[in-house]
Amino acid sequence: VPVPLYHCFGMVMANLGCLSHGACAIYPSEGFEPEAVLDAVEREKATALYGVPTMFIAELALPNFGRYDLSSLRTGIMAGAPCPIETMTQVNELMNMTEVEIAYGMTETSPVSFQTRVDSPLNKRVSTVGKVHPHVEVKIINPDTSEICSVGEMGELCTRGYSVMLGYWENPEAT
């Protein structure tokens, strides 16, 4: 778990994901250090790795990247920014993460609303954020009119479902 625990990616997706599935969470260092991440993957035979695209880019760019045995990796989640196809190809081929998924959401949606699947084609994993999670509804509206936007029109994403928080603690104005 090289992603920060103060963010929903580390705290909810990583910790809660491991806890709910009986998996082990590995914390390679206090802050993100690419060498520490790959050392931990190799030493602990990790099967999954989380990160934002720039974290994977930093790991792949290590001068000694080729010395790490990453054969135990198979999956993970990449989120926080779009992933260039070149990076996703390298993550698939050089890091053995052929089942890495892309996720999109907000802290307020606990934290993911959209996600690709492990079998999503490469081009879908780099050009979309996947499909809406079950039991979650989304729409894109014009913030000035509250009307639903046409396909291709920019607007505000609205999410509804069991995963959406009820409000900000003792802050009704922000809610």
Please name every model-derived segment:
Residues 174-175:
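Short secondary-structure edge/capping micro-motifs at helix/strand boundaries
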Residues 126-132, 148:
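Short Gly/Pro-enriched turn/cap motifs at secondary-structure boundaries
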Residues 1-26, 51:
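Conserved AMP-binding loop of ANL adenylate-forming enzymes
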Residues 54-56, 83, 164:
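Alpha-helix capping/helix-boundary segments
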Residues 139-158:
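Conserved beta-loop-beta connector loops within the AMP-binding
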Residues 28-30:
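Short beta->alpha connector loops at strand-helix junctions that form conserved
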Residues 20-23, 38, 43-51, 60-124, ...:
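Gly/Ser/Thr-rich phosphate-binding loop
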